[in-house]
Design a protein with these regions (language model features):
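Short, positively charged, Gly/Tyr-enriched micro-motifs
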Residues: 60-162
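Short, conserved DNA-binding cores of transcription-related domains
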Residues: 1-87, 93
Length: 162
């Protein structure tokens, strides 16, 4: 039977390698159980063909609200093993950066809400993430200061002549 990708389109997940297996409605949130699987790549170390090994423990990835409830994706990623050099590798997806658990769409939403006048705790509560994640994202911003010229008006609080 051909798989229809209604749920992945609804959640705006563009990776065709992510298969949604089940959706569980909890009292406080929705859990989307999915797996990331694709053909084994060649080994980055020795270049020989890797083989499918097993799946990782599910990553708990927070995601945007669906139907007014916070949701998270329990993503099981495929692991690959090179039997020539014993190198292990985990499947990657554009949904999240390598070795991260916060998806790119949540990072974009954090940046969007930081521009608005909303407190960090409210942002964290709305997106179902921790406040420290919002603070880390704020610290990622780089503000450019123009020190090439002085302002027209300058003032000092205290001064002393010695």
């Amino acid at each position: 039977m051909k798989q229809l990708h209604f749920i992945t389109k609804l959640l705006d997940i563009k990776d065709p390698n992510i298969q949604i297996l089940d959706i569980i409605n909890k009292d406080t949130h929705k859990e989307i159980i999915a797996k990331l699987d694709y053909d084994a790549p060649s080994c980055p170390e020795c270049g020989s063909q890797m083989k499918k090994y097993d799946f990782q423990k599910p990553s708990k990835i927070p995601y945007l609200e669906t139907t007014g409830m916070p949701s998270r994706i329990l993503l099981r990623k495929r692991r690959f093993k090179c039997y020539h050099c014993s190198k292990m590798m985990v499947a990657e997806t554009p949904l999240v950066k390598k070795n991260h658990q916060i998806p790119r769409i949540i990072n974009q939403k954090i940046a969007q809400k930081l521009i608005e006048k909303i407190s960090m705790t409210d942002i964290a509560h709305q997106l179902a993430i921790s406040t420290s994640t919002v603070i880390r994202k704020l610290n990622d911003f780089h503000f450019e200061h123009d020190f090439s010229r002085l302002p027209k008006i300058m003032s000092w609080d205290e001064y002393a002549f010695t």
